[in-house]
Amino acid sequence: MLRPFRRAMDALYWLCVVIAGVALVLISAVIPWAVFTRYVLNSAASWPEPMAVLLTIVLTFFGAAGCYRRGLHMNIGFFVGMLPERPRRAVGLVVEGLMAVMALFMVNWGIKLVDATWDNTIADFPFLSVGVTYLPIPIGGAILLLFVIERVLIGPPPEPPTEPEHGAAAAFE
């Protein structure tokens, strides 16, 4: 039963990485376009700034969930690492509990934010509901909660395999 859950979390993690990666690439394309139109064409496009803000929301919440799962989030493990085994596990459970509370906060208030802004539109994108732009908040919170559950039930995901010594880097030596 836990193996399918782990595989589902692996797939969800990669989905987060792809979504956040695409958002980052698009931000990296939109911002230079805004600079180009403003300073080279002397006619600033109105859409790049709000588009970059929307993509930043996507990048932030999907990227944060993915980083949490891989353990790439900010933490202070030095002092916890100095504790004996039993207190270290207790602190770990407290941390996971606090992460679950944060995830539930994101889901609860994110849904309320989406609901409150659903009928509003963005001036530069009149076809797009403001509520839709805030959907990454509750979705990211739900994904984060699933990753917390995974850590509590199964433990952290295994480290990805490292590149073998005879990998691509060896070809350039």
Mark where each language-model region is:
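Alpha-helical transmembrane segments and membrane-interface helix-loop junctions
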Residues: 1-173
